[in-house]
Amino acid sequence: MSAASVTSVSVPSSMSAADAELLTTAQELLARVWQHGRHEVATALRTADGRIHTGVHMEGSCRRSSVCAEGVAMGAARGALPGGTALGITSVVSVQIKPAGQFRIIAPCGVCRELISDYCPDATVWVTTVDGDKPVPLRALDLLPEKSRRQW
């Protein structure tokens, strides 16, 4: 799929320039690697040092073996940082392509909400409202009200 054949998400007015860069990066990645049933979501995230890390959803033949784009991006970020350095994710944007050939910002699944909030509870995570398909920023920890916290 080429980027030219998919309509980009309009940058929300409430989105910072830094987060808009994540949105663009995620859309460009997914336009390049999208494959129906295999790679349908891309994530771009920023760490406190300003670097952008990306990941793409990897669908396995056994559903349990599938890995979400958010986890892949977080693993890439972890691997790029020196040992002992906090992950320090500040923002996360994930996108998928709608059947109509349009990009859409999506919320992380429940497992990824747990993972993101475990490692970076104060990160901004962009989600889309259920009632209006409107992208909004939320604090990672707010994605899971009354989340139990593990002591690491």
Language-model features: locations:
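Short, solvent-exposed cationic patches
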Residues: 69-94
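Hydrophobic "anchor" residues
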Residues: 51-52
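Short beta-strand scaffold segments in enzyme catalytic cores
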Residues: 40-47
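C-terminal binding/interaction regions
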Residues: 2-32, 36, 85-152
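Compact, glycine-rich, soluble single-domain proteins
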Residues: 56-71
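Hydrophobic alpha-helical segments and helix-packing faces
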Residues: 15, 19-22, 45, 55, ...
